[in-house]
Amino acid sequence: MGWKADGFARMGCVLGGRDALNVYGYCSSDNYMTFLEFEDVKEELLRGFCLIKGDGSYNIVDGVKCSPMPKAMIDLMKFDYDDSAINESLDCMTDEEIESIKEYAEKTNNSKILKDKRWSEYFG
């Protein structure tokens, strides 16, 4: 595939779904995010997303903005999304990446979300 997150970001795309969050550090906080877990969803349901498939191939659907990883993670934690995907992503992160999420949360007055029992082992 060869694309990196910054390449997609320059194109104005948001990457979504478990693989994109883990591999690229970018994702969407839109309500349609759960659709990005599936390879066979019709394109009209994905309007505005970049779908990264499990096999590494991708489909770009235009018209989205990008979010840096700390913002994407905080946004995900606020929405009703698959907690296991978030935990899986946090498990893959370095201490510096976890710290960047903490810093972003403090700067944006979102520290309260980090105190949630679901994330306590990471931000405790």
Segments and roles (model prediction):
Residues 100-124:
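Structured mid-to-C-terminal alpha-helical surface segments
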Residues 1-68, 75, 79-80, 84-108:
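Short gly/ser-rich loop at a beta-strand->alpha-helix junction or flexible surface loop bordering the NTP-binding
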